[in-house]
Amino acid sequence: MAMHDPHEKNGPDAVESRVQTDFPVERFGGNGSPGVRRIEVISSQFNLVHRIIFFFGVFLIAYVYGLDGTIRYTYQPLATAEYQSHSLLATVNVLRSVIAAAAQPTAAKIADVFGRVELILLSIVFYTVGTIVEASANHLYEFCAGAVLYQIGYTSVILLVEVLIADVTSTRSRLLFSYIPALPFLINTWISGNVTSAVLKVTSWQWGIGMFAIIYPVCTIPLLAVLFVGHLKARRANPQAYKFSLLDQGVGQFFIDLFWYLDVVGILLLIAILALILVPFTIAGGAVTQWKTAKVIAPLVIGVLCVPAFIVWERWCPHPMVPFKLLKDRAIWGALGIAVMLNTAWTLQGDYLYTVLIVSFDESVMSATRITSLYSFVSVITGTILGAIVIYVRRLKPFIVAGTLVFMAAFGILIRFRGGADGTNHAGIIGGQILLGFAGGLFPYPAQASVQVASKHKYLAVITGIYLATYNVGSALGNTISGAIWTQVLPGELENRLGNATLAAEVYANPFAFTQVNPVGTPDRDAVILAYKHAQRLLCITGICLTVPLIAFSLCIRNPRLTKEQTLKEAEEIDDK
């Protein structure tokens, strides 16, 4: 096993790259897969300058998709309201989460087979095309189609930057460097509201989304450039270790192997299960319940039938999407449980938060955008400080457990402060989001780091993809539950409090238009505020209930001592059992 020149290892706790030349080249999977071998060879050529450019490139990409995500999160309610379908906001979010859940493990395998650079290029295509479709959509279904394409690109690049960082860092420094993609939230939290307001003053939300079809591809250039330079140096320095072919057995056999390795059938079954079961819950409610209609019953039945088919398939197929061997370790399944419960609970309070801030708290667009970003802002500050502490403490579990307990306390505050235009409620919702963000800095990223250090490097991309997939499954579940509660509860509350079915339907379809002509203090606005407060209260109560299993999962994970190695020696032993 070749070790690169120690003088080249200039990053803080940078892991020594391991270029293997003494094993047979496998076509797919393992250390022999082209993507894994390629990044090991490339990173072995990095000096200090290359590493600085590398991390700057990661930061720049993260800055752009982070700003875009924050702004798009604000514009999405406006878009659905413009289509007179604001209540279907959860449906759009469920579709995005379903695609993200399926895309994560798929993108991880693509990164292993074809390479990290190729995944960046693929993400650019989907991100750009999806953004253009969303910005030019005239109907909700067109907007959803664009959101799905955008989500594939967005999901792929999020996975990629986390995998790249894990590729070149040690176990004890990984948490600190994992926060590089999150650092832009320190800036975006405060400027996103200004950008959102400025765009809406001079143009429409369509341009606010569409401009990133140009900005994002341009900002990927520095990272692509440094990886390309590493690629050229690697080919010159060690051509034998870099020499491999995906087509050595012919094009036809390659696509057959790729079909099995990517587990295409498993991906389709997973999408079918999540979409067909979860989406109906977000559309069945409303002013007139639709639970007995075919468009709700049929997808539910088909989705349920797909569950046993998925389990049987994953047990039988040669390259399952879910690596059952790894899931036997509580270090893995405990962290995956944290990911699901965390995002389910967070999404419950966050899905309609922007709308509640505008309608119930009477916040401005700028203020509402900033408040919805407070979680990310505070969690990044907390997590970055924690990452530096972990380098010396070398343990993760105590912080993860503490974070889940604080997370529960934050939900208690959010249940208390869920609406009202006075200063007390304004301070209360801000305090709740800050405490939620503090908790978010203590355990989501540490849980991801813990699942990475428990696996060999050859499983790194796949296990990171599985973790992020379960994260998005949590989002899908949260979106579904919030959408179901919102559509089942809010229409009746509005009608009861307003005493006018027509006005209630108008508010339900487009609450933002209603707030513009009905200021706080008018009878109708006060009635609407009470209705929205009631719905948000139910969402937050459901969320705090889910923090109980969240805490339980945090107690189940392992507490290994972190080292300067890329993975722990214990991980090698666990995976080989």
Swiss-Prot record:
Organism this protein belongs to: Aspergillus fumigatus (strain ATCC MYA-4609 / CBS 101355 / FGSC A1100 / Af293) (Neosartorya fumigata)
Record: glycosylation sites: 500
Single biological process term from Gene Ontology: intracellular iron ion homeostasis
Keywords from the named record: Cell membrane, Glycoprotein, Ion transport, Iron, Iron transport, Membrane, Transmembrane, Transmembrane helix, Transport
Recorded phenotype for the gene knockout or disruption: Leads to lower ferrichrome (FC) and ferrioxamine B (FOB) uptake activities, which are reduced to approximately 60% and 50% of the wild-type activities, respectively.
Topology versus the membrane: Multi-pass membrane protein
UniProt KW Hydrolase keyword: no
Transmembrane segments: 46-66, 87-107, 117-137, 145-165, 175-195, 209-229, 264-284, 293-313, 331-351, 373-393, 397-417, 427-447, 461-481, 537-557
Name of the featured protein: Siderophore iron transporter 1
Expression induction: Highly expressed under low-iron conditions and down-regulated under high-iron conditions. Expression is regulated by hapX under low-iron conditions.
Source species, domain of life: Eukaryota
